[in-house]
Design a protein with these regions (language model features):
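Substrate-binding pocket helix/loop in short-chain dehydrogenase/reductase
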Residues: 56-57, 61-69, 158-161
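Active-site loop-to-helix junction immediately N-terminal to the catalytic Tyr of the SDR YXXXK motif
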Residues: 60, 104-112, 124
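C-terminal helical subdomain
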Residues: 138, 160-191, 198-200
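Active-site helix of classical SDR
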Residues: 80, 114, 122
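The beta1-alpha1 cofactor-binding region of Rossmann-like NAD(H)/NADP(H)-dependent oxidoreductases
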Residues: 19-31, 62, 175
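Residue(s) in the substrate-gating loop at a strand-loop-helix junction
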Residues: 98
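Alpha-helical segment proximal to the catalytic Tyr-Lys
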Residues: 85-86, 127-131, 189
């Protein structure tokens, strides 16, 4: 977060970094309060916190399941609930999901379930907030070359998943960021409640 802030400040923008436990409903209030205190208002929310649990269902322990539910699912609920009263009219919300919700990939069961859940939360939020001009959309990346993606995977796993895309490569962070940037712009004002796949052609 500090590196991102430094980059923003270098380009003459404004930035603050706030650390909070997104699985704690009380803690989720803090970034909203500090953002309003510093900037005066909140215009957009990106739900991007998440962890990966890469295990077959039979091997998932109760504490592991609880943790991924807390971080991937409950955090989005808490953030949307807080945003419902804090985000400005005509604001923008983007939730990061995953292409795996549309597939049957081994070892992705718990992760895919949390992402499917936040997709529905976001669609419902879009409906509930629409009269205020607030849009809420979902982006569903395919395999993107990040530290999170590589958790628990062998070289063979990574090569196999790279080959799934018609473009024949892993995604890059910027491939996703550019679509998110569009969705929070004025040009996307008539896009609402949608799920946009960004996966290089995984069908």
């Amino acid at each position: 977060a500090d590196n991102v802030c430094a980059e923003i400040l270098k380009h003459h923008g404004e930035c603050i970094a706030v650390q909070a436990n997104v699985s704690d409903p009380a803690a989720v209030k803090m970034p909203f309060a500090q953002s309003i205190s510093h900037f005066g208002s909140i215009d957009l929310l990106i739900n991007n916190a998440g962890i990966l649990l890469f295990k077959e269902i039979t091997n998932i322990q109760d504490d592991e399941f609880d943790r991924i539910i807390d971080i991937n699912f409950k955090s989005v609920f808490y953030a949307l609930r807080e945003a419902s009263t804090k985000i400005s009219d005509n604001g923008r919300v983007v939730t990061i999901s995953s292409t795996v919700t549309r597939m049957m990939l081994p070892k992705y069961g718990a992760y895919a379930a949390t992402k499917a859940a936040v997709e529905q939360l976001t669609r419902t939020f879009a409906r509930e907030m629409g009269t205020r001009g607030i849009t809420a959309n979902i982006v569903s990346p395919g395999p993107v070359d990040t530290e999170l993606f590589r958790v628990g995977k062998t070289i063979q796993d990574i090569e196999r998943m790279s080959a799934m895309a018609a473009l024949g490569r892993l995604g890059k962070v910027d491939d996703i960021a550019q679509v998110v940037l569009f969705l929070v712009s004025d040009e996307a004002r008539w896009i609402n409640g949608q799920n946009i796949a960004i996966n290089g052609g995984i069908i």
